[in-house]
Amino acid sequence: MSISGKLLTEDNQLISPVATVYDYIALLKPRVMSLVVFTALVGLVVSPVVVDPLYGFVAILCIAIGGGGAGALNMWYEADIDALMKRTQKRPIPSGKISRGKALIFSSILSVLSVFLMGVLINWFSALFLAFTIFFYIVIYTIWLKRITPQNIVIGGAAGAFPPMIGWAAATGTISLDSFLLFLIIFMWTPPHFWSLCLFSSSDYEAAGIPMMPNVRGERSTKNQILVYAIITAVCAIGPYITGYAGIIYGISSTILGGMFVYFAYRLWKTDTHDETVPIAKKTFFFSLFYLGAIFGILLIEFLIWHFIIR
């Protein structure tokens, strides 16, 4: 038998489930980490420096380890509120599969190791950038902002937007306007992405006492801000083409995709009741995932075609 993720023997004695490799992988937030790895890879590849494949692999591996360590640290700190939310109750710590102590040790080792290896094997500028990103995500966002302000995801979203700049820094040892534009796309995309999620899962956040925008300012204010941020995101996404860094394929694609993103946000803005809002919010949320992946994917593909096939 099982009760709330705990296992019972035949005589009803409570025992802790044994953690598996998959539980420790889940602790790394693999879905979030996959986005971190992908955007970092794009930043590394589209930089002006052509890196050796092995060098690039090591750099991305270090970023992945750091992203996973940060995700695990986040789960360690938020174990109390994860236990209150249906969406997160089955995570390794609240389900009792991994203790908070083990999670802290595991995540700390990964975080420190990623920065050390990045510095020794790649360069110390990108290593310090990675360390700052981990610090920002855990201390600024997770510990400080998330539980006190509905603007948590706006400011804290910077942590999720840094990876392409870290990838760029790994290749070049510096940052530039072009890498900052990649950061800006993700930074502006984050609020409409997460707030559309909150519009159809607000009860979860409310139960955990997290002040997300729909619960604090209401659905109408949230929809207004989603539309504004979607427009800003669409404009920022055209930036690499305007500056001349990206080509016409990216320029046309980012314009079309940006228009679609704004259209979904506009449809959401037009809804009045909660029942009308939920299905459109879900569509907006899932399209936002596709949108970001497509923007970075097209940028990467166009760059590879131009530099390694046409040239």
UniProtKB/Swiss-Prot annotation:
GO terms for cellular component: plasma membrane. Pathway: Porphyrin-containing compound metabolism; heme O biosynthesis; heme O from protoheme: step 1/1. Keywords: Cell inner membrane, Cell membrane, Heme biosynthesis, Membrane, Transferase, Transmembrane, Transmembrane helix. Signal peptide: none annotated. It comes from the Bacteria. GO terms for biological process: heme O biosynthetic process. Pfam families: UbiA. GO terms for molecular function: protoheme IX farnesyltransferase activity. It is a multi-pass membrane protein. PROSITE patterns: UBIA. Carbon 2 of the heme B porphyrin ring is defined according to the Fischer nomenclature. This is Protoheme IX farnesyltransferase. The gene is ctaB.
